Amino acid sequence: MPKGQCALRMSLVVAAVAFASGAQAADRAALLGKLPPTLQALYTDPITVEPSAYGDFQLPPKPWRWCHSESYLGNPWRVTANAELKRLVGEAQKAGDVSEFLVSDSNGDTTQQISQMRSFIDRKCSVITTIAGSSTALDAVIADAYKAGIPVVTTAGAVTSPYAINVMHNQNLWGYQEAKGLFEKIGGKGSALQVEGIAGHPLVQQEDAGFDKALAETPGVKRARKVSGEWTASTTKSVVLQSLATSPGKIDVVWSTGSETRVIAEAFKQAGRPLPVIGGSLSGDALGWWHEHPGEFKFYGGEVSPHVAAQNAFRVALRLLQGQKPIINTIIAPMPTITDADFSAWFKPCMKSDSTALFPIPPENPFPEDLMNGYFTGGAATPEFDYSKVPPSCGS
């Protein structure tokens, strides 16, 4: 091909890509423009949105068969989320709205989860809620569920299928806002230890990008080191101790996004180092440690709550089954901001420093009904869900 023609073709390709990107951005802006401004603010660039596929969804008759597909029930967070969903669906069963609640667990095997979801389709479930084991591998079976008239609602992570309704936090925004809050706590000057989750995980990449953006906006804060805690207490404590052993300089803040803030504090104490401001997801053991060490635990973060994850899936699925029309396919749930000044409202006497399987109940509903209404055409609260009736962390 002559050099001039090659250059012309290349310029046309670049122009076409730019045009397509611009059109997609315009479509995205128009779609998000249908949401209230408070909800639009929850969508940053990494979040992909499409129109909901359920604008003309045909309502299944009552009583409904509710099916839940779990990808892994092997940690306390997932067990807690599953128990809360079981409680909520159980209340709907008592009211006569649900005939049966079926649960599958693929134990980390995506192929098995696909097979289990196909079984749910064969059993003519009215709705499938899921914590997906893959963002892409379930797309075909989700499309098959849609063709069978079965809506699929994901929580605690999204899938790429346009036939699902995803309910999730914006991990990119969470990582950014937490970092900004931590940096403000130290006056915009100091040293930050970054403790990410599982390196390379899609959610971790989004969280890290949020941290990087906040760091770039705060030139007075320098990154001391970046380590991977893998969202587990033992690994997190080990890598923090290693960092402290090889980084003699002062650490002013620790940014993390998991529920391992208590072991981070313990690592600093073990190393004989002053406690920094620690960020992450609040947990029962962290609140227990705070109560046992008054005045020492400085915190800025939020809570990725298993209770709320289950509640959000239940509420969105219930609205679908009752005829409310989602505007978009990815619903962003707000993340509550929590500091150590708020701990007294979150702490319960049952919380000890070893309460690793205990997750605090937010004092107030972090996703109020009027806010959720903005995601639906004809949005209205469902009487089947009453946040005031959520059991307390320490039981009745």
Predicted regions span which residues?
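Short beta-strand elements in bilobed, periplasmic/extracellular small-molecule ligand-binding domains
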Residues: E91-S106, S191-Q194, D212-S234
